[in-house]
Amino acid sequence: MPEINTEEVLGNVSVYPVAASTTIYKGEIACINSSGYLVAGSKTTGLKAVGIAQETVTAVSAGDASCEVKRGTFLLTNLSTDEVDLADVGSDCYIHNSNTVCATETETPSHSVAGVVQNIIGGKVAVKFN
C-alpha cells in the first residue's frame, strides 16, 4: 500500500458558520444545530455542543458570519433546581441555557448533552467539550 500524507488538524479551536438571524456571545456554549450551523446553547433537543464561543458574532443569513469556538474544560453555572454534583463526575451533563448546565435531561423539551463533568469547583461545573 502506498504512503498517504494524512494531515493533522492542530489545536483546540475551530471556526463554524453561524445560523441565520443568530447572535452568539463570547463565553456562551456553542452548538451545531440540525442544519449544521452554529447556535448558542439552549434547552433544545438535538444540539451538538462543540465548545465555548471565543467572540461575539451576529449572522443575518445562514453562514454569512463565522465564530471561533474553543474545545477544552470550562467552568459553567450549575442549575440550582437540577444540580450537577460530585457523583456526576465522568457523566454527561446537559444544556439548560447558553451558560448553565444541569444534571438531567428530563424536562420538555429534553436537554441536549453539554459535555462530560470533570469536577465541581466553587459551585460551578467543570465541563469538558471534546
Residue ranges: model-predicted function:
Residues M1-N130:
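Surface-exposed, low-hydrophobicity beta-strand/loop segments enriched in small/polar/acidic residues
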